């Protein structure tokens, strides 16, 4: 599986991987595009989270808090995971991650490593991550 952030520049990466998959006859490769502004695919979670990225980060948080996920001792990753704020947005009120634009206004960079971990945990009908533990 290649789970790709399909938002912005990632869309081009998804296209290239799909072309190479066909060209090289990589029939077992599954390219999974994830648009971080999409709706939450889990119906129950959709009532609590504003978008798929917020939901993915919440899954990451819950897995780490429960001990199912052990993160590396990586100061950049830990910093990215702990500095991004949440807000409540909309009606009914749903949890939403602080936007990357708001992060930039606070002088912070895009949380690329944290997003990569969230993507690595993305189930999206692919497999049950708990079966790997």
Locate predicted features.
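Mg2+-dependent endonuclease catalytic cores in nucleic-acid-processing enzymes, primarily RNase H-like
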Residues: 1-93
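Acidic two-metal-ion nuclease catalytic site recognized across multiple nuclease folds
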Residues: 78, 82-133
